[in-house]
Amino acid sequence: MSKTKVNVTIDESGDVDRLLQTMPDVLQHKQLPKALRAGAKPIIRDAKQRVSQPGYPGDKPGKEPLKNTIHAVIRKYEYTSIAVVGCTWPDGNHGWLVEFGHDITRTKGGPVFGHVPPYPFMRPAIDATRSEVAGSVLLVLQMGVREFNSQ
């Protein structure tokens, strides 16, 4: 994944937080990664539509198109889980340059010969899918609670 960090907190009236507080820890640890993966899917889908298509002027020859490097990685920790959505390394390691733009130099720290403007694709995807993400996460967690209660 890229070194650039974008933190997103989704709070739809606190529904997800309230649901997590009522869930037993064992159930949270099992269902939260599933919910995060479901929540990452709309962001990935939207970002893939927004990113420059293969063959754009700054495309890296011989590497996977940037569109195909957008993935989610779910990381589990002792008390929580997180979803990291972004361009995977090594083929997508230039994703942050596309997202934020950059100066053109011939050597590191050398004179600037031009500037490549930013073409944001991740941040707009996050903003556009915020309610869909919250709904997906909430739905998966609710299904997990129903499944747990029916056992």
Model regions and ranges:
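Short, Lys/Arg-rich flexible segments
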Residues: 1-84, 90-91, 102-151
